[in-house]
Amino acid sequence: MACYVERPRTTCALGGAIAVINALPGVTLVNHTAIGCGGNLSGAISGGAGNMGDGVFAGSHMPSSAVGEKEVVFGGADRLTEEITNALDVIDAELFVVATGCMTEMIGDDVEAAVRKVQNPRKPVISISTPSFKGDAYAGYEIILDAIFNKFIPKAEKKEEKLVNIFGIVPGFDPLFRGDLREIKRLLERLGLKVNTFFTADQTFDNVLNASKASLNILLSPVWGTTVVKNFEEVHGTPYFQTTLPIGALQTARFLRKLSEHIDIDPALLEEVIKTETDEYYEDFIRASDTIANRQWFFYSATVTNSNYAIPLGEFLYKELGWHQEDTFVTDQLKPIKKRALVKAFDETDFGSKLTLDTDTQRISRTLNKTRPRNQGQRYWDNKTPFFLLGSSLDRATAAEVGGVALPVSFPLSSRLITTRGYAGFRGGLALVEDIYSTLLG
């Protein structure tokens, strides 16, 4: 169903595919779209994802068929074949992915035929369909990962008992994805596991090729990546464990204990790791408690994020900072089945907030203004202050309108430079504490 989107917080499906390729080692995208399509998307992703920049032969450097009027009239298959051939000649990549856009889908180019013409055993080529009418960037994330992991990589003859894959964190559209993945990997390695994150600096294309050897897929999202891990289980026989991204000590300890129900982890080691990490976490946290208590920094709060961050952020604010988390806005364009999955996950996590699904920035602003009444001459009234908003760079103006403070954490995140920052796990929880209270100190 169509919906009105004002100041969007996502792109089309092609944008999601571009963001994945931007972060995935050894893979290059060949963009079969109209002139300017890939460049515009790359600029939006690069700037909106914490100014993450472009990868090698990704983003603004990616090969493109640059379809124009001639190809629209006579077809663009020959132009695509030419572009793939040239890309194979000059780019040293392990895998080439041809991604389509709206124009080339509408004129009906036979992309599969073009791919078959140029197949090279040393440089394989696959294709995906990513026009805007297939979904937004999060759908593009699922489309490209499904193609690579469930249609391209080989089936493993034998599983590695301690190897796990991480899915659900969406590169770029979760702007803190690298830091989040690093922290999850660090914790799991402390438990004796081997971890494929696919998108961190230590990963190579071999991690992609060997993903089918994993004994378990860990899905850190209530909605995104579900298609990927379900198809992965059918194709490769690998079960999955689905949960939300853990932020802070309480959520992370719970996550690790639940994980131990799905893969063999030594119970004594598990409790030792949780204890040492928790002790370190609160030893550092308590150093900030004097400043927090003396300044009376206890807030009404709201979050405006995607599905991946909505629940863990709200729970962290409520249970670890002791704030009154009133409104949780989720800005994804969710189909009914994903809406139900999100609502179910939200209802299972009690932090006293109201869940609102809305893609419209202006409507979100109006809602927050309505719930924070201005003084109309009364002697007493509840103005619900002080107020803190965790959202995107778009939401700073809304926070200012209601007399609050904002920390941008979600896409589009153009007002911060993100390299290794992440909020997942124990260390990520402390990083979030630092960022929140540094914003107040500033």
Name every feature range the model reports, one short phrase each.
Residues M1-G442:
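An N-terminal assembly and electron-transfer interface module characteristic of large anaerobic redox
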